[in-house]
Amino acid sequence: MKTALKFLLLTAALLVHTAYAANKPVAFVSFSKGFISIYQLDDMNKIADIEVGDGARGMGVSDDGKTLAVAVKSAGELLLIDIESRKITKRIAVGKNPEFVRVLNDKAFVAYEPSNQMAATGADAAHQKKKTKDDDDATPARVTVVDLKTGKKIADIEAGMETEGIEFSADGQSLLVTNESDENVSIHDIATGKLIKKVDTKKHGLRPRGIKRAPDGNTFAVTLELSDKLLILNKSFEVQDIISTGNVPYGVTFNAAGTEIYVALAKAKAVQVFDAKSYAVKRLINVGERCWHFTLSPDESKLIAACGRSNNLVVADTQSGKILQDIPSPGTPWGIITYPRSTGSLDFKK
C-alpha cells in the first residue's frame, strides 16, 4: 500500500512538473557529447536531458512549440522531437555533417556538407580548405528543407563550400547563406533554389560565419571570423558598412527592436554589443570560453551563452552585463534557443 501510494505521489509530482514546464518559457541547449538539455528560463533549473547521439548541433522549434528539430552530426540526420513527451518521433537522413538549422514557417532549413570537409582553424587551415575547394572532387555544401508537419524533405538547395550561417529575407522569399571556404554570402530563391547573387567577402575579411537580418529587413549583419570584422549588407545584398569587432566574432543577432547588434567573440570570452545605427560599442558582456552561440530571453532582460570550451552556461543581465548565473554544463554545450522563440544567434523572435 505504501509503495503504491509513493508511486501515485511520484506520478502526480511528475505530471505537475511537466505541466508547469509546458506553461513556462524554456531554453533548449545542444551538447556535442550527444544530448539536448531543457531548462526553465525563469531560474535555469534543468527539466530534462534527451539523448540524441554524438554531435548535437543546430536546433529549431516549430511555430506551435510542440516539435524540436535537431541536427545530429554523427548520424547525418535531422531529428524531430516531441517536446511534451521528449521522445524522438522522426529521423530524417540529411547528409554528412549537418550543422546549422533555421526554421521558417514550420520548414527546417539544414546545412550539410556532402564532401565532409570539416571545419578547421587558422590561416593555414583556411588556405588548405581553399585548395581542397579547388580540387575537382570537391562538392559544395547544401541546404535541405524539411517540412516539420510531415517530417519529409521537400527541397535541396546547392550552396557553397562549407556553408555555415543561414538567414532569410524579410519577405521570406530569399535564403542567405555564409560559405566559409568560398569566402562569400550566397543568396538563393527559396521556391526554386536558384542562385540569385553572390557577395564576395574576402576583400573585406576572411571566413564568413554568422548572419542575421535586422528586424526591419533593411540590413544583414555577417561576422568575418578570421578578420575580426562585422559586415553590414543592405536589403539589396550590397556591402554597406564594415565594422571592427573583438577577437574572433562568431554568432550574431539584433535585438527585437533593431537598435542593438550582439556579437559573440569566441576568443575574447565576451559578447560585444553595438549600436545598430552608429556602430559604436555600447558594452561588453563577459561570458566563458568559446561561446559560439547565445540567445536573449523572450523579454530580453537576460543573455544566455553556451560556452563549449569552459563547459558552462552563462546568464547575464542584458543591460548591465552583470553575471547572474554561471551554470556548470559538462558535455560541450554548442547551441541554445528558447520557446517562446526569442532573438539569438540561432533563431529570431516571431
Model-flagged regions — what are they?
Residues 1-7:
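Positively charged n-region of N-terminal signal peptides that target proteins for export
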Residues 7-16:
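Bacterial N-terminal signal peptides
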Residues 17-350:
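Predominantly soluble domains enriched in secretory-pathway, periplasmic, or organellar proteins
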